[in-house]
Amino acid sequence: MKRRAPIAAALSFAAFASIVPTATAQSQNLVIIDQDGFKSEISGSQTGYQLSLSAKQRGYEQGIRAIQDGARHVATIRQYGRDNGAAFNQSGRRNSGFLGQAGFYNSAAINQAGRGNLAGVAQMGRGNSASTNQTGSYSALGVVQVGDGHAAEVTQSERGEVKLVIQGLNLFRW
């Protein structure tokens, strides 16, 4: 009985930690999240300077939400499966983010506010959608969708903006 108590405590802590949002408020921190399954959700929030967040999900009907406030942040989100949704919001200067999805009927949303930000969306499969919004000057974004039935919405305001949208490429054959 005494040996089972630490194991039960560790398992309950692991279960609790998998649903608690991740938050940091310093500089040069890194958060890495890797999740498999069905109907899971990841929520991360970072405030500070030069922070990194990397999240990966495999499965279906999953969601990722990341929020970064400050400067020089990096967000990388990858999802594999179907009916998944991912979004990240970044505010500040010189932030960058990448959102990649492979599968069917996935949705991606990026919102960046500030100066000198960079955003990228890559989707492969069928029926995926992407929405990107950048407010601020001297920012760039790119959307690449490979497969059929995709939708993309790109909104940029201010000056010095660069955007690239590529849609409808056939699936690559190796």
Predicted features by range, described:
Residues 2-6, 12, 24-45, 120-174:
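Long terminal segments
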Residues 85-144:
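Surface-exposed, polar helix/loop patches in the mature regions of secreted/periplasmic/lumenal proteins
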Residues 20-22:
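Polar/acidic, low-complexity leader/linker segments enriched in S/T/G and N/D
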Residues 39-41, 50-52, 100, 111:
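Glycine- and aspartate-rich repeat motifs characteristic of hemolysin/RTX-like Ca2+-binding segments
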Residues 55, 77, 88, 99, ...:
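A short, polar/proline- and glycine-enriched secondary-structure boundary/capping micro-motif
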Residues 10-18:
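Bacterial N-terminal signal peptides
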Residues 46-81:
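N-terminal, post-signal-peptide region of Sec/Tat-exported proteins
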